[in-house]
Amino acid sequence: MLDERSVPEESKDEGADENHEHKGEEFGQGVLSLTGVYNTANHLYNNNIFFSNIISMPPKRLPVSGSEPKFTQVMWGRAIGINNNNCYAYAVGDYEKKRSYKSVPGERAGLNTSGSSYLSCKVLPKMVVADNPKKVYISNAEEKCKPGYYKVMMFLSPGVRTYFKQGDFHFYKQHSVVEYKAKKGNTYEEIANFFKVPLARVKKAGGTASPRPGKILKFKCNVFSHKRGWATGPLLTDAKGNVIIDPRKASKDYGRLNYNKYCSSFCVKNRGIKVGHTHPKVGKKTG
């Protein structure tokens, strides 16, 4: 609801006619405007389109294949998972208990992974595919991945070409089912509104009159998640705390790093992906 104090009242001077010669024209324009409003309203009514439906329309979600990994904090949200798996490893599902340094696109393929390559959307997508050539292919955001694959998006924070700030990449992955751990004070309405899903779906997942703190609610939900390097567990929210429906429209500004450059979308096989230095290089018997 708008704060009435933020809406200035129109003064008599501001609302008065400054040029009486244009009164007739304004009246004619008003008649045309009213006619247009009537025609629009008549069209909406005849087609069973109501204002309440328009303002409550759910956000457009990108298609899913049905092979998306479930969103969960299990493993990834624990200390070992947080400290050894960055956004790239998380997005492609390559969980490791110990890594000496963060996974970089192209590293497993033996390609040049110097910092300057992080500034090029022409280079990075090819490096991602090269790491798992038989299990990753370039797609587009609106395309449904084939069965057994799910969507991943990559963005860049361009940065400045210096030794200390070379830009950075960031990945998001799609889910069709989420696990949510109910917190004290949560209501089903609050959870449903946050995820933008039907209330009945969340209530069914809860199974009780109100959410029991600590209970894991599992329900269908088409969203994206990400992981901020080795600093966080899996996140369903963007830089402004909103659930991520489409990463391209989400806030990605984290101050020093602003991942505002959409680079590419991929379809990733939902098992068997390996990235980084902890695995054998891609060869005839790998991929």
Report residues per predicted region:
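Active-site or metal-binding loop neighborhoods of secreted/extracellular toxin and effector enzymes
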Residues: 213-287
